Amino acid sequence: NTHHHEDHIGNNRDIQDLFGIPIYAQLAALPYLENPRLNDLRLYQRIVWDWPKKSKGTAIGESIDAGNCHFKIIQAPGHTEDHICLYEPDKKWLFTGDLFCGTNFIYLRRDENYLQILETLKTLSQLEIKTIFCNLKGAVENGREALLKKISKMEQLRDRVINLRDKGLPPKSIRQEIMGDEGAWNLITGGHYSKQNTIDSIFFGMRPDRIN
């Protein structure tokens, strides 16, 4: 598991029961595997995924072998604190979990950290990457170029927000100026994903759910 969210650990128990194989995750994610109700699910999450069955995880080390592939484990916080990526240096593959998700950036979860995601992506961009394997976009060729494109867009957005903040505009006015009205994701998720979360995380330099 790249991280502890319900849509990533949901099949663990069935896989273990069917194949009897270990499930690996970062050490901090293991309590969520053993007790999935530690995940505070919103209504939309309960409708789509609900809480998974309990499963037993094993702490992943600095590398892992899978067939003829040798993956290096990279700590990749931002989407969650326990997020990891897997890098295969010979094939130049990067498995990004929920960290990459395409070159555009509009909506942020309330428990994500925009600036931390940006710094992690910049770290990953130092790798030689031929193909990104993304949870949302599938196989993305020219992976390093895709990362650099996303980084550039995120830096431009960050700079615009900070510039307007320094001119005295409040977060909601900045969101309206740069991104316009909220979209369907804000309504469907009850604000869990929103444009405002993106602006707030840049404006205050932290996760929106930690802003007083």
Segments from the language model and where they lie:
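Active-site HxH/HxHxD metal-binding segment of metal-dependent hydrolases
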Residues: N1-I64
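Short coil/loop residues immediately preceding or within conserved phosphate-binding loops
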Residues: G61, N68-F71
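Metallo-beta-lactamase
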Residues: H70-P77, E81-R160
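Accessory terminal helices/loops
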Residues: Q126-K130, A139-N212
